[in-house]
Amino acid sequence: MINDDLIVLLEPIIKNMGYELWGCEYLSQGKHSLLRIYIDKPDGIGIDDCQEVSKQVSAMLDVEDPIPGHYSLEISSPGIPRPLFSIWQYQRYLGYEIHVKTFKPVNGKRKLSGIIVSASEDTIVLDINNEHQEILLSNIVKANLTV
């Protein structure tokens, strides 16, 4: 999980460039680690946008060095199966269907799909087959909009 301090470092730089910091993932796979930063803007993200943000963020990360060890930096658009990281993103997509993977089972399942009915500070409520299911945000490993 990405440290909030890293978000605090990244957000002003990305925002000042005219983009929205959509979210971050840090994937550690043995010797190869990856810091993936998702950016967005109303008219979409292109390769040039990713390159521009990569240069600025890379320079800041080299100076601040918030992540120990070696890793690759990737700047990306959230894409079509858009990942959801923050409560404001769940609120933005009320009424949309999402896929959710949880740490602990919810009603015996760790993979759920449903329509976002509500999103509060620490929980979301999904409509799954006309039944409301509350899921703690702290229990969500990954959530994506359904394509």
Swiss-Prot record:
UniProt lineage: Bacteria, Pseudomonadati, Pseudomonadota, Gammaproteobacteria, Legionellales
Subcellular location: Cytoplasm
Species annotation: Legionella pneumophila subsp. pneumophila (strain Philadelphia 1 / ATCC 33152 / DSM 7513)
Family: Belongs to the RimP family.
Function comment: Required for maturation of 30S ribosomal subunits.
GO CC list: cytosol
Entry keywords, A to Z: Cytoplasm, Ribosome biogenesis
Matching CDD domains: YlxS_C (cd01734)
Alphabetized Pfam families for the sequence: DUF150_C, RimP_N
Primary location recorded for the protein, binned into one broad class: cytoplasm
Superkingdom per UniProt: Bacteria
Cross-referenced InterPro entries: Ribosome_maturation_RimP, RimP_C, RimP_C_sf, RimP_N, RimP_N_sf
Protein name: Ribosome maturation factor RimP
One Gene Ontology biological process: translation
